[in-house]
Amino acid sequence: MFPKINTIDPYISLRLFEVKPKYVGYSSIDARNQSFAIHGIKNYEKFSNAGFFYTSPTEITCYCCGMKFCNWLYEKHPLQVHGFWSRNCGFMRATLGIIGLKKMIDSYNDYYNNEVFVKHKNRVYTHKRLEDMGFSKPFMRFILANAFIPPYRKYIHKIILNERYFTFKFAAHLLSFHKVNLDNQTTYCMTCGIEPIKKDENFCNACKTLNYKHYKTLNFSVKL
């Protein structure tokens, strides 16, 4: 289901991406292994291979991008979780390669989609579901403001959300709404969320060559 890990030493290949790890002391896999071993953690190799070192019983950290992974102990696919939630991590790019990372994110999207069903167009119900899923209040306000305005209101079937996209599913068609970084006015690829693209485009060149399904799109700007 997921691509194989590149056998090239990630610390060396990070130079290709001009990335300086945030925790240089844990750049080697031996150092990351030791961080787990001294705390008596078993079967830790999958976490250290995914770039993480031990921080606490409830948290591990990526040595490169600094991503915090909570409630990690029973996760079966830490590498996939890492790539999905930290797509610009230099370690992940060096380990899987750009194309491999894109393919992994695409396959993992199906596994990690969250859904909010809109029942009776109830704002309170939807707000509570979004809050339970951990989304910020500004994001929830934006979702609700756009979900319940005419003419879309009567067509909404459900709302699907994940880390990079939120999609309103309508009875007649599908519209994907992509987040835009307002600080530097950069838009990212609708499919992978990694590569920056031009304002009048929706997909990067790599995703176009992979023949991803192209959805009819509308772009909204939101600062979370």
From Swiss-Prot:
Question: Which stretches are transmembrane?
Answer: none
Q: Where is this chain's protein located in or outside the cell?
A: Host cytoplasm; Virion
Main localization (coarse): host cell
Under InterPro entries, the record lists: ASFV_p27_C, BIR_rpt
C4-type Zn finger ranges = 189-207
Which residues of the sequence carry a binding annotation for Zn(2+)?
A: 62, 65, 82, 89
Q: Name one GO biological process term.
A: symbiont-mediated activation of host NF-kappaB cascade
Entry keyword set? Activation of host NF-kappa-B by virus, Host cytoplasm, Host-virus interaction, Inhibition of host caspases by virus, Late protein, Metal-binding, Modulation of host cell apoptosis by virus, Virion, Zinc, Zinc-finger
The molecular function GO annotations come to:
zinc ion binding
Gene Ontology, cellular component aspect: host cell cytoplasm; virion component
Pfam families (UniProt xref): ASFV_p27, BIR
Q: Which regions does the record annotate with the repeat BIR? A: 29-92
Expression induction per the record is: Expressed in the late phase of the viral replicative cycle.
Q: Please state which protein family the record places this protein in.
A: Belongs to the asfivirus IAP family.
What does the function comment of this entry state?
A: Prevent apoptosis of host cell by inhibiting caspase-3/CASP3 activation to promote the viral replication. Also induces the activation of host NF-kappaB.
Q: How does it assemble?
A: Interacts with subunit p17 of host CASP3.
* Protein's name in the database: Inhibitor of apoptosis protein
| Species in which this protein is naturally found | African swine fever virus (strain Badajoz 1971 Vero-adapted) (Ba71V)
